[in-house]
Amino acid sequence: MGLRASGTGFVVLVLLQSCAAYKLICYYTSWSQYREGDGSCFPDAIDPFLCTHIIYSFANISNNEIDTWEWNDVTLYDTLNTLKNRNPKLKTLLSVGGWNFGPERFSKIASKTQSRRTFIKSVPPFLRTHGFDGLDLAWLYPGRRDKRHLTGLVKEMKAEFAREAQAGTERLLLSAAVSAGKIAIDRGYDIAQISRHLDFISLLTYDFHGAWRQTVGHHSPLFRGQEDASSDRFSNADYAVSYMLRLGAPANKLVMGIPTFGRSFTLASSKTDVGAPISGPGIPGRFTKEKGILAYYEICDFLHGATTHRFRDQQVPYATKGNQWVAYDDQESVKNKARYLKNRQLAGAMVWALDLDDFRGTFCGQNLTFPLTSAVKDVLAEV
């Protein structure tokens, strides 16, 4: 019995160590509260044990200081951080910037010593006041002239966090969201330098394809497709990860993005294969109400009566129904991605976003909340 008890304890220890070895970074978006009916998501819907880190998106910058964006952000901050009462190991970060913020605003702040200093000084007290463990910089698509300013911002922010922690508090975490497109990486990021000062980098390995391309294609392929044009050879997660590592990002700081949303297209002809022409983005989802984008829970509804396919080379699924063509991820594809990042010895996975997964567990017929995020977690926990 003694040997069996000891063995069981060892297995449990290995499982805990295995799960703890990988980060599962999960974004939550504050605007998801405004979706109608069952699409409305608040932080109290989140399982506190699902992710290792939850990032609240987004904070604003007003008068060069970090600030709230939504009218009820402070209430939502408190609701999110209350999750740590149930799971004290959970880390929460506040993301500043995002798509609607605009790279020009970041550029204006970071390029001037005084405004940059004002912003940096405002961050630690704001995070401490609202119970966050760190900051996520979502300066998306910085320009060529912004490269050194972003590096300086990251370096000085990390130094400020270190100084603030000298009072005896745990140092605040610092992360950044980085585009996975080769052109965007080359133009705006000194990967080797910013990696030195960041605790982790969330690589946005999705949105490689969209309605702006005039043809159908998958937005989050794991690998290059055999039928991809030479211009698309960089547009996959495998290339983006390899390129980031080649540029000097440490594997133990690189987190690979996995989307819980799909991209939809309206076909312009009866053709449905790769490269088929489109007339524009797909019709809006019932809850997200944005052309060309569908939450996973909306995709589950779409799949009723649809024809499903899988790109074997890219290892991702798509579905067609009428004149609608939808690229998405399912449990099989996200598990493959999680196994891939483990094989590459990356720091973990990032999910965009919890509120786009089937967070209620009522849409996808699996009787499981957050089925995609849970599938990623299960693979990360495998020995």
UniProtKB/Swiss-Prot annotation:
Highest taxon, organism lineage: Eukaryota
Coiled coil: none
Localization terms from the record: Secreted, Extracellular space; Cytoplasm; Cytoplasm, Perinuclear region; Endoplasmic reticulum
Glycosylation sites: N60, N367
Disulfide bonds: C26-C51, C300-C364
Residue ranges of every copy of the GH18 domain listed in the record: 22-383
Signal peptide: 1-21
Keyword Transmembrane helix on entry: no
GO biological process: activation of NF-kappaB-inducing kinase activity; apoptotic process; carbohydrate metabolic process; cellular response to tumor necrosis factor; chitin catabolic process; inflammatory response; lung development; positive regulation of angiogenesis
Important for AKT1 activation and IL8 production: region residues: 324-338
Pfam families, sorted: Glyco_hydro_18
Assembly mode: Monomer.
Name assigned to this protein: Chitinase-3-like protein 1
Gene name linked to the record: CHI3L1
